[in-house]
Amino acid sequence: MYLSRACEQGLVEEKTITEAVERLMDVRIRLGMMEDYPSPYANIPYDVVECPEHIALSLEASKRSMVLLKNDNHFLPLKQEQIHTIAVIGPNANSRAALVGNYEGTSSRYITPLEGIQEYTGEKTRVLYAQGCHLYKDQVEFLGEPKDRFKEALIAAERADVIVMCLGLDAGIEGEEGDAGNEYASGDKLGLKLPGLQQELLEAVAAVGKPIVLTVLAGSALDLSWAQEHAQIRAIMDCWYPGARGGKAIAEALFGEFSPCGKLPVTFYEGTEFLPDFTDYSMAERTYRYTDRHVLYPFGYGLTYSQIRYSDAHADVTDFGILEPVTVHVTVENTGTYPVQEAVQVYVRFSEREAYDPGYQLKGIRSVALECGEKKEVCITLSPRDFALISEEGKCLVHPGSYEIAVGGQQPDERSSRLTGQTVSTLFICKTGNVTEVEY
């Protein structure tokens, strides 16, 4: 309805609508949806549903997506032989809802973080559990007093050698139902703070004085600045919504069966006060491309249990024609003791950009498997489109001039360098020719 009106008013050209429809129909044709015979996707045999291969793939996705945000003095991985009692505390510790988010199917089995830790440790380690608080209400029981589960959480914390806090959100707090004011009913959350009494619970448990690993189960960014700065929180791992058996992956990550290697696909801000209103379509402060502010965790950031070294970053030449592709080379080496899946990132910035143009933008990424001590050369080719900027008229233009290309395991910002202790390599190349329009 609105698109039809926009077309009538000359706000959208009919050819633009046609191009969008053609793309949509192209995908449907390639999926076999327009054929006379039934699509193979409509006749998947039931015996492949939740088959061992799919379960293994789901578990691998859980492992690959986890992002290690903090790991003071290499506190993780935990050494089970040194732990007699572990306390698992928090509203998401034994929550199935926190595993799957929304748009999920029904699994034949769910493994929560609590269950994953219990299964991994077996009888060798005593596992204590306390819910601590409701996900967002002041009490767990309907007729309970406020903070009705705090005491049991503190008792468990006092008796533990290590505490695993499981906090965050679930689809009941963040979702796609209704408008931004529909928090707690599957709408958009109103802020970045941990909801309900979760922050207060975290601070109360930290006051006990035992080392804490904070695992966050959520589908979006949260303000974890207190946990990042507090010395008692030794490690923070963002597990997102890890899937039906996600608790198994969380336990294996905590105890070092593999190293978390994920990188953040979003920016974690410390607050929303400086962000523009939702109806303000200027890009100032929106995403890593348009902000120069200090952020909590930058886009592209993530730690591992290993150590990765980048060296010999270069391009074959430094001068390129306006529509010439640019191939970037870099050597990546795993100098640590854990195999990793490193995400090599390439960012591009036009040195002569206008104030409203974006800064560094991720234009190339390559996932590289590295065994301990292994070294690989990685080549990433950037197309002319990767150097283009969008004009105020909506045209996709490549400009002649100087470009900066940053290569490494993170974005080229001061905060990432401070968090990881590493820097990226910056190359300078020149595009020669005239301003040229390219396809989106």
What spans do the regions from the language model cover?
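C-terminal non-catalytic regions of proteins with extracellular/luminal or membrane-system context
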Residues: 1-14, 26, 48, 56-440
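Conserved, charged catalytic cores of large soluble enzymes
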Residues: 22, 26-45
